[in-house]
């Protein structure tokens, strides 16, 4: 039996129950998502874009799915402590894949701004929700997105009206909590109306030793002149598998930063899709990982320049120790009408041991003739000369290796005012 079949059977048998416990508008695309999953199936290692991640193996185990929305006995405010010092945020929680609404933060948000659960948002702003939900993440191209759309019952929404600036970052913490192996299907929807500004930090944490499988679909809409920063920090566990897709649509003059950081995980696949659909739009896509033991991170990106005078900057850095495995496949597509495009892609990797492995495939696909584009990749090992010099100055070898590793992934181009994030 194919790995996706158990999830198709689950939905077929319990569709009424899934829909009954879900936010209303989330039920509309389920039938199409089911048909797409049946047609596409899961990606296989025969696919060039998934050759380093065995999706079927990851989804094959029998995970529990909380379709009844049973209450999880945990107070996230008691079990979570942020590792980032002096970080002032508006803090929200999702437990597995359910928005935690029993205790909400005191209102630090400007009037008209919404941050909270999908169900309440769809009841409060039904027209806005129907205009955006599912519109950036089509189910007809990726079986995992189709699976998520078919099964997701709740989510988190950030909505910022036109011209509103949210000074304090919004922080969403995804907590895994269960006594049995569990699957979570999460959605995040971000709607930035013209000339609005906000920042969202999403953190993943596991507090139990059982196996977790997460699918996550993030949709970001940036209106004309909007500024939005999205930070994704994964600090889960070696028993956690995550498949995440970030889909961004930008209008004229908008500026979006997407920053993914992986520090602790088991197997992670991150997909990034960015569309620059309005002139003078700017996208910054960057990522950093420090992996060891048997950790695995597979990153795929696709940036589309559809119109003239847009800029994209892409930088991913990885440090791999022990038997860690990393992969990066990035594509920049410059369409024929996208003259005066500036697009840059860089991948830098450090393998700290002979057993660590990194696979990289940067790509440019250009159909316009008046552009400035570049792409490049380097993969190397620790500088033994520098390591010897540091040891000769009294720094223990393990500390010297760590210092050199951290230095190799330091960021020099992030926005200076975001020092805490």
Predicted regions and their residues:
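Hydrophobic/aromatic-rich, well-ordered segments within soluble, folded domains that form packed cores
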Residues: 27-43, 151, 381-403
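Conserved beta-strand/loop scaffold segments within soluble protein domains that form the structured core
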Residues: 106, 111-114, 124-388, 392-395, ...
């Amino acid at each position: 039996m194919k790995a996706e079949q158990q999830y198709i059977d689950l939905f077929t048998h319990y569709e009424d129950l899934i829909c009954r416990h879900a936010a209303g508008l989330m039920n509309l695309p389920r039938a199409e998502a089911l048909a797409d999953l049946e047609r596409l199936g899961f990606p296989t290692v025969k696919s060039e874009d998934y050759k380093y991640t065995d999706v079927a193996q990851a989804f094959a185990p029998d995970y529990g799915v909380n379709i009844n929305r049973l209450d999880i006995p945990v107070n996230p405010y008691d079990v979570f402590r942020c590792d980032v010092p002096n970080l002032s945020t508006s803090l929200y929680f999702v437990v597995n894949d359910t928005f935690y609404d029993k205790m909400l933060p005191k209102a630090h948000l400007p009037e008209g701004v919404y941050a909270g659960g999908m169900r309440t948002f769809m009841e409060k702003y039904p027209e806005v929700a129907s205009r955006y939900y599912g519109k950036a993440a089509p189910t007809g191209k990726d079986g995992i997105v189709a699976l998520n759309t078919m099964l997701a019952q709740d989510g988190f929404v950030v909505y910022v009206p036109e011209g509103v600036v949210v000074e304090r970052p919004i922080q969403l913490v995804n907590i895994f909590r269960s006594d049995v192996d569990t699957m979570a299907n999460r959605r995040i929807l971000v709607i930035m109306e013209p000339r609005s500004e906000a920042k969202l930090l999403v953190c993943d944490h596991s507090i139990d030793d059982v196996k977790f499988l997460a699918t996550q679909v993030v949709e970001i809409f940036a209106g004309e002149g909007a500024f939005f920063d999205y930070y994704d920090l994964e600090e889960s566990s070696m028993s956690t598998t995550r498949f995440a897709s970030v889909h961004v649509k930008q209008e004229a003059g908008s500026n979006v930063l997407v920053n993914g950081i992986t520090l602790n995980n088991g197997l992670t696949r991150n997909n990034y899709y960015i569309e620059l659909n309005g002139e003078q739009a700017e996208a910054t896509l960057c990522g950093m990982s420090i992996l060891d033991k048997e950790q695995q991170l597979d990153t795929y990106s696709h940036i589309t320049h559809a119109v003239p005078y847009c800029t994209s900057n892409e930088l991913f850095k990885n440090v791999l120790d022990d038997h860690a495995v990393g992969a990066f496949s990035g594509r920049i597509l410059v369409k024929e009408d996208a003259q005066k495009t500036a697009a840059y892609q860089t991948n830098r990797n450090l393998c700290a041991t002979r057993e660590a492995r990194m696979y990289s495939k940067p790509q440019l696909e250009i159909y316009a003739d008046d552009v400035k584009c570049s792409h490049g990749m380097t993969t190397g090992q620790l500088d033994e000369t520098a390591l010897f010099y540091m040891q000769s100055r009294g720094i223990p070898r393990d500390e010297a290796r760590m210092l050199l590793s951290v230095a190799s992934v330091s960021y020099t181009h992030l926005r200076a005012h975001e020092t805490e994030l």
